[in-house]
């Protein structure tokens, strides 16, 4: 019997969606590298708009945690409110209406809470999940690291924003490549990942 073909995790604009999770005002001073991860998520949002990739945005209990931060650039998106530590219940109808959907690109906070639970729910639906590691964080770097390892153990792909952007555009001949090139000309800001990944880190091996 032939071995099962591994899932490669390719992303294409026509079968992908971008999830933006809970980047809200009250988290601003508590989440590690908050400005940096919001900046990267904003870059992903701009690319999604250029490539016509659908985008969904959630807010966790906005009455207490405030609105989405303006620097995300999410004007025109209608946030879906939730209290569940997963985006999926709030987005169920949107997911059901997209039978062509294969890949979810996931940005936001917190890694060990809503990002992890969203990932598990999406994997349970048979979707491929690409966690944008430079656009996800937690209050604690330990929680962030263990959550990334946990998601990888469960079958999610850990990807950088630039890696996913270049997969989505696919070709320097793409009509939007010049605009996208301007967005990635400067490297994504440091969000503390190097210290998590360097050395003999058993959680990510």
UniProtKB/Swiss-Prot annotation:
This is Isochorismatase domain-containing protein 2. SUPFAM superfamilies: Isochorismatase-like hydrolases (SSF52499). It comes from the Eukaryota. One of its GO terms (cellular component) is nucleus. Keywords: Cytoplasm, Nucleus. Interacts with CDKN2A. PANTHER family: HYDROLASE (PTHR14119), ISOCHORISMATASE DOMAIN-CONTAINING PROTEIN 2 (PTHR14119:SF3). It is found in: Cytoplasm; Nucleus. Belongs to the isochorismatase family. Disulfide bonds: none annotated. Pfam families: Isochorismatase. The gene is ISOC2. It comes from Macaca fascicularis.
